[in-house]
Amino acid sequence: YKRQILMSDKKIRHGHKSKNGKSFIILPIIFCLITYLVLYLAFVPSFSPVISAVGMFFSDNEKDYSTEYDNIFVPVSENSTVPTVTKKDSNGQEKTYVKNDSVQYPNYGNLFGELIINDCNVDANLFFGDNDVALRNGVGIYAGSFVPGYGGTILVAGHNNTYFNGLKNAAVGQKVEIKTSYGNYIYEITDTAVKKATDRTAYDLSADYENLIMYTCYPFDALGLTTQRYFVYAKLVSGTPIDKEAN
């Protein structure tokens, strides 16, 4: 009977040693995994924008993004004719419009125009949408705003260290030209401002008149995302509006 008790006691102690041994191995592994996860969640969001911005400087040696978008831009020459229609506007005045069915509206990610500011040495492909591919190859219209000629706010984004670096030289009175396949539009810069990235009063997407707003990260020599944005505001000077009604 004593022998049985001793044997049982040995089994119990052996069992405790096995459990302690497993705990000694498993607990440090779990602790390391938790520590890694916490550090990852804490630091990756901070470094990602910087890494992405630094990558912009080496983009020539990276993947070719030029084949990842559709180009529907066919410049309108001086001798070409864009189909138009004459109608009365809200004031009863005769006005010429670009026929709606002659406009090839861009899909998200399409290159559909060119944005030029001669005084700022800005000449960039204009995309509909402001995703990474668009901003690596030009500047992009926020998809929640409007295309030129549609009579609303055109909100255009570009990187401060590439295509929109020249905005630092923007001044009141300078002209901005946007070329599309259905017409060319001229805007005049009316104001510039530095505002917080979270300031929703910096733009009005519900405006019932055509206006152009261009923006980029600020300061211009900063890498990655910043807490400020540099805005350039412009009014429409010339260009045939699009007839919003189907023809």
Language model region names:
Residues Y1-Q4:
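Conserved small/polar residues in nucleotide/adenosyl-binding loops
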Residues S8, G15-N247:
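Solvent-exposed, non-transmembrane regions of membrane-associated and secreted proteins
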